[in-house]
Amino acid sequence: MSVGEGPDTKPTARGQPAAVGRVVVLSGPSAVGKSTVVRCLRERIPNLHFSVSATTRAPRPGEVDGVDYHFIDPTRFQQLIDQGELLEWAEIHGGLHRSGTLAQPVRAAAATGVPVLIEVDLAGARAIKKTMPEAVTVFLAPPSWQDLQARLIGRGTETADVIQRRLDTARIELAAQGDFDKVVVNRRLESACAELVSLLVGTAPGSP
């Protein structure tokens, strides 16, 4: 069965197929529009399970545990690593804290037929593909290098040094897009969102 044909299935105890939710791992360079695409997907797919990352850092003002992040103490985080309960994890800011993707909520949602979306960086996507081969990795790409530069500069939220670092990282990420199962070019939000909806649930809501 191809990715666009509908939910995958697995045999139940009585031999009848049960739907298994698709797991899509989304990655892409800074300023390519990942957050906007994620918002669109959450609006289009009401039952979408969007993976909330676990982190060892302290909550910032206004952040809600379980909504923005799962805030976990360093000892517990290490236990999750040792027990293989993270699909991927990384040290942030030179080891100042750690963050990662909890395996249990993702597998539990998929097992009940719910589509799952995970947004991570390039290294995270590669790690998840190794630990969860059935996941579909998607690289969200800009229409052109010039477009990505314009988006980064146009945000007006970073210094010139930060923008240059992000562009240097983006070159590395763009060079690796061939490692992904699918590349979606974010020319127009509606089109990019529709492609991802199709990957997650088989067809875009409202389409014939």
Curated annotation (Swiss-Prot):
PROSITE patterns: GUANYLATE_KINASE_1, GUANYLATE_KINASE_2. Pfam families: Guanylate_kin. InterPro entries: GK/Ca_channel_bsu, Guanylate_kin-like_dom, Guanylate_kinase, Guanylate_kinase_CS, P-loop_NTPase. ATP binds at G28, P29, S30, A31, V32, G33, K34, S35. It is found in: Cytoplasm. One of its GO terms (molecular function) is adenylate kinase activity. Its main location: cytoplasm. The keyword Cell membrane does not apply. Its EC number is 2.7.4.8. The modification N-acetylserine is found at S2. It catalyses: GMP + ATP = GDP + ADP. Residues 21-201 form the Guanylate kinase-like domain. SMART domains: GuKc. GO terms for cellular component: cytosol. It is an enzyme of class 2 (transferase). Keywords: Acetylation, ATP-binding, Cytoplasm, Kinase, Nucleotide-binding, Transferase. The keyword Nucleus does not apply. Belongs to the guanylate kinase family. Essential for recycling GMP and indirectly, cGMP. NCBIfam families: guanyl_kin (TIGR03263). This is Guanylate kinase. It comes from Mycobacterium tuberculosis (strain ATCC 25618 / H37Rv).
